[in-house]
Amino acid sequence: MPFWYSNSKLIWLLSPFSLLFWLISQLRHALFCLGIKSSYRAPKPVIIVGNLSVGGNGKTPVVVWLVEELKKRGLRVGVISRGYGSKSKTYPLFVTENTRPIEGGDEPVLIAKRTNAPVVISPNRQQAIELLLSQAECDIIVSDDGLQHYKLQRDLEIVVMDAERALGNGFVLPAGPLRELPSRLKSVDFVITNGGKNQYSDAVMYLVPHFAINLKTNEKRQLKEFQSGVAIAGIGNPQRFFTMLEKLGIQLERTQAFQDHQHFEASQLEKLAENQPLFMTEKDAVKCQSFAKDNWWYVPVDAEIIEAEKQCENLPHFWGKIDKLVAQYRNG
């Protein structure tokens, strides 16, 4: 919502509801901390990758990066997710790159495709972990989202934040974009800011595009070969994708933003770009592959994550925590 990042009067009109939201969430958190409500401890270490605010912060590229880095260290990694946008009739569901996005959710299918890691979705994270461990050998589990899902105990927490929008107006829902108060950042292990650094950054992520891939033929083409086109995006922050393409020198004749996790129909997109290249995100592409046209291209990005400050050693410290954590579980 635009007013989340402004001084709109709507903020004060909605602030009583935000107070109620905060009280309920605080009570719920306290009940888990005191053991009044039960929580689940997985038999393997769990890393949460989540957000403090709603909207597109860049969580999925961080999950992909984390899984790939853990695998480089010789660890067998499994991924669980709520599977937002999934319409599966049964849960938990084992997701592969061939799972229909309407069943598996666009982000879990993308993660499975990019990492080749076992992925299981379910609103019940315990059931997701139990199915995951029954069908795959895992040394460590990455939870895609779930920072506020206190029913699942965790060993490390990573928060991903948009560097520019940060925490918005600082209010919790619905007056602001936050799911919890900014003070929650004091208890997480690592903060990655997307697109630059701010006062909260432990590390900074830049999303790096290398080429465009044709949805129908899988042809790869350098982005500099394109002069113009049309772009669509059904992600949390569509403008970030459009701006990226323009910075690469592509003149966008038209842009069309859709809601996050949009379910696309061929007719929606065909009329947008009949004779021009149509660019979309990789997340959108997994939902459009089955009815793709010759002029449709997606632009995959890789997460490049660096220290927030040159003299810092936040990343080595973070990996040291993970090494220690895995060793503790292996030694019982």
UniProtKB/Swiss-Prot annotation:
<keyword id="KW-0443">Lipid metabolism</keyword>
<dbReference type="InterPro" id="IPR003758">
    <property type="entry name" value="LpxK"/>
</dbReference>
<comment type="similarity">
    <text>Belongs to the LpxK family.</text>
</comment>
<keyword id="KW-0418">Kinase</keyword>
<protein>
    <recommendedName>
        <fullName>Tetraacyldisaccharide 4'-kinase</fullName>
        <ecNumber>2.7.1.130</ecNumber>
    </recommendedName>
</protein>
<comment type="function">
    <text>Transfers the gamma-phosphate of ATP to the 4'-position of a tetraacyldisaccharide 1-phosphate intermediate (termed DS-1-P) to form tetraacyldisaccharide 1,4'-bis-phosphate (lipid IVA).</text>
</comment>
<keyword id="KW-0547">Nucleotide-binding</keyword>
<comment type="pathway">
    <text>Glycolipid biosynthesis; lipid IV(A) biosynthesis; lipid IV(A) from (3R)-3-hydroxytetradecanoyl-[acyl-carrier-protein] and UDP-N-acetyl-alpha-D-glucosamine: step 6/6.</text>
</comment>
<dbReference type="GO" id="GO:0005524">
    <property type="term" value="F:ATP binding"/>
</dbReference>
<dbReference type="GO" id="GO:0009244">
    <property type="term" value="P:lipopolysaccharide core region biosynthetic process"/>
</dbReference>
<keyword id="KW-0067">ATP-binding</keyword>
<dbReference type="GO" id="GO:0009029">
    <property type="term" value="F:tetraacyldisaccharide 4'-kinase activity"/>
</dbReference>
<dbReference type="GO" id="GO:0009245">
    <property type="term" value="P:lipid A biosynthetic process"/>
</dbReference>
<keyword id="KW-0444">Lipid biosynthesis</keyword>
<keyword id="KW-0808">Transferase</keyword>
<dbReference type="Pfam" id="PF02606">
    <property type="entry name" value="LpxK"/>
</dbReference>
<keyword id="KW-0441">Lipid A biosynthesis</keyword>
<feature type="binding site">
    <location>
        <begin position="53"/>
        <end position="60"/>
    </location>
    <ligand>
        <name>ATP</name>
    </ligand>
</feature>
<dbReference type="GO" id="GO:0005886">
    <property type="term" value="C:plasma membrane"/>
</dbReference>
<dbReference type="InterPro" id="IPR027417">
    <property type="entry name" value="P-loop_NTPase"/>
</dbReference>
